[in-house]
């Protein structure tokens, strides 16, 4: 049974298969090898995908797009809140998750991003089945390099809903590098510049010339792509219209906004074919007697978007820094994604790396799906990680758990290669503990409140009578897909403790990964002070608990024992609030010892 490769993009998606010794994209029922990532819900109860959804003559609230920008995210994520105004369809808060409110045939239903994405995947699956004349159940899928754990899990869930088992999940720039490497089979260092419709990724890969491809570094932005260029052009066109006429542009009218967006996309494409000027022409009303007509030259286009374009170079520099490289160390630069067709983008990359290093012969719209298809072919050949194609990718943010007091303990460090497995030894906090939670975080700060919660493991001790400090071992595992699993083992009974892991944490802050790292570096002193206080509190509380155990085992009278335990609880309660100075723990411990001695002597 054939395993296919799918690039599920923000604006366009693509499916490919490896046959006759090479990868090739599969044409859909509309005769195109890329499919717009658009879903429409007309009133007849049907579901339309791609071109037919884009052209559907139905209210815009029934046409869904941009799903990749909020799949696996939380309602209060910054990017979700910022994007709400730009979407013609309704997105609402459903138990902390962004859900799409779809009105179809006078009935309103809630659709998750995973469900919406699964419709696109079903369409691609059907296209592949029609081409191959067989049932397809397995897929290699690609995701942006800096997708977090929740976004990866949600993408895999979308595939499951579409009837597809994800046999491997790889980063988009890694897939592009695979597509190039299998054609050239050379010992080179490759930089992949992946500028798509909704996300931007950079990866640096080293090839041995034997099919072995190692990802040295990667960086990116989850919310930077061609659609952001479209928004800049729309804002410019609206501003020009408002300045020239007495009327204000009707931004509240979704029909008019759709026409303007389509006109801006058309102008962007025209200027991407080396034309020096074009016009943004868009009708204002349904009578077509009033319109926006804005002249847009190549120079003006570059000026409007230059900060955005140059911002991608900052991310390129971050990837180079992570790999401990300079631009001169790069042998080839792969331009991938539809936005790399823009002349100014090519010019900036040419200026940075030199014209001779730019690889433009690889199809930017198809490269990622083709790379996924190559990986699929090698997996299908019978070896999960075949010798001919070794892919090693890296962890982009450290992963760990929250310890007592809100201290973040890194288990898997940023920059480590996966698959990998790490263990952490833990202990219960109180006597006779029956249940507990182990929050899982991603981030670089020592204070968990500044990191991002990605899940939680619930520990159930089955009503065991256990003492404080009961030994546990947590196993953190990142599989070949870059997805995380956590299990906990009772080291004394050697049995797995029942656990439940869910991706339900706080909102993801939409900032560059390198900025997260820079914040951690800038706040290192504050974090170290916090860690010192937490460690001192742990030592203080351990001393108080040891004394509590001694009191409980002692032969003093019940009255004295009760009074002594009351003193213990008073000093434990004091430690719940962190003091300002380290010395306070020493002072309070001395006071505790003196006060409790009154009842235990």
Segments from the language model and where they lie:
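Oxyanion-binding/catalytic loops of NTP- or PPi-dependent enzymes
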Residues: 1-82, 87-94, 101-119, 126-601
């Amino acid at each position: 049974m054939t395993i296919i490769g799918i690039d599920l993009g923000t604006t366009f998606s693509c499916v490919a298969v490896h046959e006759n010794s090479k990868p090739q994209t599969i044409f859909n029922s509309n005769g195109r090898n890329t499919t717009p990532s658009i879903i429409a819900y007309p009133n007849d109860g049907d579901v339309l995908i791609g071109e037919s959804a884009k052209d559907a003559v139905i209210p815009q609230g029934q046409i869904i797009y941009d799903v990749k920008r909020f799949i696996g995210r939380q309602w209060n994520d910054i990017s979700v809140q910022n994007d709400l105004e730009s979407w013609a369809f309704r997105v609402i808060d459903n138990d902390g998750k962004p859900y799409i409110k779809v009105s179809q045939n006078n009935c309103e239903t809630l659709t998750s991003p995973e469900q919406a994405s699964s419709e696109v995947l079903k369409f691609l699956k059907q296209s592949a089945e029609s081409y191959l004349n067989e049932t397809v159940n397995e897929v290699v899928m690609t995701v942006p390099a800096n997708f977090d754990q929740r976004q990866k899990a949600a993408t895999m869930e979308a595939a499951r809903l579409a009837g597809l088992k994800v046999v491997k999940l790889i980063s988009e720039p890694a897939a592009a590098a695979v597509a190039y490497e299998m054609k050239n089979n050379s010992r080179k260092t490759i930089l992949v510049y992946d500028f798509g419709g909704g996300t931007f990724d950079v990866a640096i890969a080293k090839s041995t010339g034997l099919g072995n491809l190692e990802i040295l570094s990667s960086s990116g932005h989850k919310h930077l792509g061609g659609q952001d260029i479209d928004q800049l052009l729309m804002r410019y066109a609206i501003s020009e219209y408002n300045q020239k006429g007495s009327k204000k542009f009707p931004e509240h009218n979704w029909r008019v906004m759709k026409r303007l967006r389509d006109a801006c996309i058309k102008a962007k494409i025209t200027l991407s074919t080396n034309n020096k000027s074009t016009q943004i022409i868009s009708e204002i009303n349904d009578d077509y007697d009033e319109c926006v007509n804005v002249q847009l030259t190549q120079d003006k286009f570059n000026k409007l978007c230059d900060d955005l374009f140059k911002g991608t170079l900052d991310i390129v520099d971050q990837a180079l820094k992570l790999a401990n490289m300079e631009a001169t160390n790069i042998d080839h630069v792969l331009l991938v994604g539809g936005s790399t067709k823009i002349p100014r983008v090519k010019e900036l990359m040419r200026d940075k790396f030199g014209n001779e290093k730019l690889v433009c012969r690889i199809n930017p719209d198809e490269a990622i799906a083709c790379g996924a298809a190559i990986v699929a072919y090698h997996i299908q050949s019978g070896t999960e990680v075949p010798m001919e194609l070794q892919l090693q990718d890296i962890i982009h943010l450290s992963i760990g758990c929250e310890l007592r007091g809100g201290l973040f303990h890194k288990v898997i460090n940023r920059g480590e290669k996966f698959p990998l497995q790490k263990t952490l030894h833990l202990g219960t906090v109180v006597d006779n503990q029956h249940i507990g939670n182990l929050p899982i975080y991603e981030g670089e700060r020592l204070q968990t409140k500044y990191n991002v919660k990605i899940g939680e493991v619930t520990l159930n001790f089955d009503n065991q009578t256990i003492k404080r400090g009961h030994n546990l071992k947590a196993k953190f595992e990142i599989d070949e897909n870059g997805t995380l699993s956590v299990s906990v083992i009772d080291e004394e009974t050697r049995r797995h403790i029942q656990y439940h892991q869910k991706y339900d944490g706080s909102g993801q802050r939409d900032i560059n990964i390198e900025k997260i790292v820079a914040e951690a570096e800038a706040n290192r002193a504050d974090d170290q002070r916090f860690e010192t206080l937490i460690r001192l509190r742990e030592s203080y509380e351990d001393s108080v608990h040891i004394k509590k155990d001694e009191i409980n085992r002692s032969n003093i009278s019940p009255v004295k024992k009760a009074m002594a335990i009351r003193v213990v609880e008073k000093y434990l309660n004091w430690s719940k609030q962190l003091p300002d100075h380290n010395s306070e723990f020493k002072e309070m411990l001395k006071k505790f010892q003196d006060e409790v001695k009154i009842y235990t002597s």
